[in-house]
Amino acid sequence: MYDRLQAVEDRYDELNELLSDPDVVSDPKRLRDLSKEQSGITATVETYREYKNVNEQINETKELLGEKLDDEMREMAKEEFAELQKEKADLEERLKLLLVPKDPNDDKNVILEIRGAAGGDEAALFAGDLFRMYSKYAESRGWKVEIMDANPTGIGGYKEIIAMMNGNDAFSRMKYENGAHRVQRVPETESGGRIHTSTATVAILPEAEEVEIELHDKDIRTDTFASTGAGGQSVNTTMSAVRLTHIPTGIVVSMQDERSQLKNKDKAMKVLRARVYDKFEREAREEYDANRKSAVGTGDRSERIRTYNYPQNRVTDHRIGLTIQKLDQIMEGKLDEIIDALILEDQTSKLEHLNDAN
């Protein structure tokens, strides 16, 4: 571990020199990439330097205890030695976590996609409930939410809704929401009071920048059509809706939320870029995931990750066996208790894998 930490510190010093190099300063892309790399290892280097400083103090205190001291001085040195040992152990744990490979997408914005699945109108209503839950969570964290496209049912639900979430650490927290969400409740239309089970799927995609995924015009087919509202009726007579097809992957994105064809195409390109980026990234991870299945699941959108039981006011996350009797609060956007537990489980799993590799 310490060889790796020393290598990280050496790289940090090298980056400091590079960032003051006129050739680097005059190259915006390289400057940004190197600055991002340095920012990503700063906490590790600072903690490692603190660790080395504590180690030096421990050695000095050891030497002091080997000398002839009066009782009071010896007692003080012993207390200081014990405190330093505890501080060293704490720093070692922090360093282990800092060495866990960071998801390069963690600091990205999020494209959120929610779709009603099994359960008809009730599934669409639940999709709407999930979107409101995530919107309130985003508000609590100071993130901005912008609806990019929606297919409402007319009864307060959505067959599909796509939104952008902009804010610090958005992907690092929202990525654990990928998967199938199941609801158990009595629908308002149910006269017999029977509990129904419905499902909605959630996809969390990191926003991909143009420099990260290049989409060539020749690979994209663009179709335009008239926008339609709930029930299929036309909402305007102009051909403002846009459908983009990425020919190499077959990925299709339709957008009709805006009255402007140009705005719809711009939004569709953002979603298309994110979906293509996500597809390539998932394929690149397949071999790694085959060797180490994450403790918090595969991220597969068909994987059932959570159940929301309304009669019992209960939420269960099946990946980590966590049950919380606070469904009313969860649906108001108070998700941190669940997400923090998922992050801890994920970090613990990665740390165990790192220790096994060493």
Curated annotation (Swiss-Prot):
InterPro entries: PCRF (IPR005139), Pep_chain_release_fac_I (IPR000352), Pep_chain_release_fac_I_sf (IPR045853), Prokaryotic/Mito_RF (IPR050057), RF-1 (IPR004373). Gene3D superfamilies: 3.30.160.20, 3.30.70.1660, 6.10.140.1950. Its main location: cytoplasm. The keyword Protein biosynthesis applies. Methylated by PrmC. Methylation increases the termination efficiency of RF1. Keywords: Cytoplasm, Methylation, Protein biosynthesis. It is found in: Cytoplasm. One of its GO terms (cellular component) is cytoplasm. Peptide chain release factor 1 directs the termination of translation in response to the peptide chain termination codons UAG and UAA. This is Peptide chain release factor 1. The lineage of its organism: Bacteria, Bacillati, Bacillota, Bacilli, Bacillales.
